[in-house]
Amino acid sequence: EIHERLVGSEMCIRDSAYQMAFDNSGKMTAWTYAGKQILHTNANGTIASGAAPDFNSCRNIDNDKESTANVGCVNSSSTKIIKALTKDDASGCATMTVQGNAKNCQYTIRYTFYPDATVDMETTFSPSGATRRLGLGLQLASGFENVEFYARGPRSNYSDRKTGSYLGRFTTTVDDMVEEQIHPQTYGDHEDLRELLLSNKEEGLTLTVQVDGQASFSLSHFDESKWIEEGSNLWKIPTHWYDLVRKPQVFAHIDYWQRGLGNNSCQGDVVLPKYECPTSGDHTYTLRLKPNL
């Protein structure tokens, strides 16, 4: 049975197995299952800065060059609760809706909390301008290394580079998903995501993500913000793979849309309009998150 309560300035949702907490702006501050951390945390057990699910439009690849010179990247947003946490005694579920504002995009997340530790995140993106990607980013705790996914694979693929990739179920590790380009760039997208399982064998914990709607994902142990530059500055920054530091946490993107690659690395064709991120309208996917031992 779900119990919701206010602890100081935080709202807590808990039952005998799991706990989630949010601050008064709607940002997640804690998420545990059977006492085990799901997201990357500080030494005191609170979710680390940038680890909670948040809007994330960060990406940089050589093909983008001047095409995205004026399209900035953000990995955080301002949020507020627009529908307070409410429990439905008949179903035993609780709901809450959070609204976020980021550069060129407003979004809402309608949370549904179930008694069995399942959490639905019905997320609607309402862009007002150009972005490099429309989606959520988060950082999973150290140890979520083993990956099984039902999407296009086994190699990375993008909205304009996916017809040669099979839709199927694949297994790998986060480390094995690295693509060492000459210069660090955004990598590892997998389109048409249906289900993603991340396993932490040391803790005996698995997080399952099921998707209703359009989505893609990528996973990495490297902090993408270290090579994000606007415009065509990518090659002006003398960064190599050996300059990067592998982090213990897992940096995850679950996107509704990521801009296609195009062919502009050598002054070729830019991304076709149908593969650019939408700049208007409402675009929704639902993520169903379920931790299991």
Locate the predicted segments by residue.
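Positively charged, low-complexity/disordered segments
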Residues: 1-8
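Beta-strand/loop-rich accessory regions of lumenal/periplasmic or secreted enzymes
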Residues: 9-10, 14-293
